[in-house]
Amino acid sequence: MLLRPRRPPPLAPPAPPSPASPDPEPRTPGDAPGTPPRRPASPSALGELGLPVSPGSAQRTPWSARETELLLGTLLQPAVWRALLLDRRQALPTYRRVSAALAQQQVRRTPAQCRRRYKFLKDKFREAHGQPPGPFDEQIRKLMGLLGDNGRKRPRRRSPGSGRPQRARRPVPNAHAPAPSEPDATPLPTARDRDADPTWTLRFSPSPPKSADASPAPGSPPAPAPTALATCIPEDRAPVRGPGSPPPPPAREDPDSPPGRPEDCAPPPAAPPSLNTALLQTLGHLGDIANILGPLRDQLLTLNQHVEQLRGAFDQTVSLAVGFILGSAAAERGVLRDPCQ
């Protein structure tokens, strides 16, 4: 029978950090829990390696005037502000270089602290209206001009995460409901309230209230509430018919009845164009055709003149040719010989 090797006992979880040290140094994966912590490197050694310095004691230490001046001087270097200008979204590597440069000057600040410090100085410079100038205003103004931060402060956008409760939308207030800020405003009764105030019904309903004798039966359905469309449509209007139903008979107008209001009747359809308008349009088209045919007529006249010239030249050429032929024939027959011979 094979014996399985015994498993080592589980390691105890690391103890929580004490309040005295708010920012403990993180351990590397290779360090054992029982080994003593490594000795922190000096700022000069970290500066030589090009690594940012992130001491725990510098997290809550306020910035001094010397540190602020060194930070602004480092940011004003051409290599630094050009790197920030070229890549604003990935500015953390550049601020690491800034932190390493400050570490060489015995200023122990993290890249995030350098970034927040410049943002704080920039915001304070924008908000300083009508106040005496500060010691670093000239450097901040120059750095903002180089980085293109002369605009107004942009609001910070926060997307609602899983840990933050989302705000519910406020309900849309009723148009007829009184504002809650008014002290004399009274709540309006609902549509289903049977003990509604008759004065409110008389004031806000479009039709006068009915008497108690004309109340509907208990089993009958409630009457539909009047709408704006129903008030615009006259009561004697014919009901809507389907597409297959025959047209309604024409209604006869009573000569004694007063004429209807212009807003009750539908607008008349657009009249077809008159004969004069059609004739004017036709004449306009004919004028366009005449304008097109005019240049063609001039070209035909020019061609006719050329043809007449060619015909005259052809007749003259034929006459010369005939005379030449007849003269040659007479010379051959001796007709033109001397009569003295």
From Swiss-Prot:
Main location as per UniProt: nucleus
Region annotated Leucine-zipper, chain positions: 279-310
Post-translational modification: Phosphorylated.
Residue numbers carrying Phosphoserine: 18, 21, 54
Matches recorded under Pfam families: Myb_DNA-bind_4 (PF13837)
A GO term from the CC aspect: nucleus
Compositionally skewed regions (Pro residues) per UniProt: 8-23, 257-272
GO BP annotations, alphabetical order: male gonad development; positive regulation of transcription by RNA polymerase II; regulation of transcription by RNA polymerase II
Location in or out of the cell: Nucleus
Annotated stretches, region: Disordered: 1-62, 146-273
Alphabetic keyword roster: Activator, Nucleus, Phosphoprotein, Transcription, Transcription regulation
Alphabetized GO MF terms: transcription coactivator activity
Complex formation: Binds to the N-terminal region of ATF2. Associates with the TFIID complex through interaction with TBP.
Domain notes: The leucine-zipper domain is required for coactivation activity. When this domain is deleted, the protein is able to stimulate transcription from a number of gene promoters.
Described function: Acts as a transcriptional coactivator of ATF2.
Protein name: Undifferentiated embryonic cell transcription factor 1
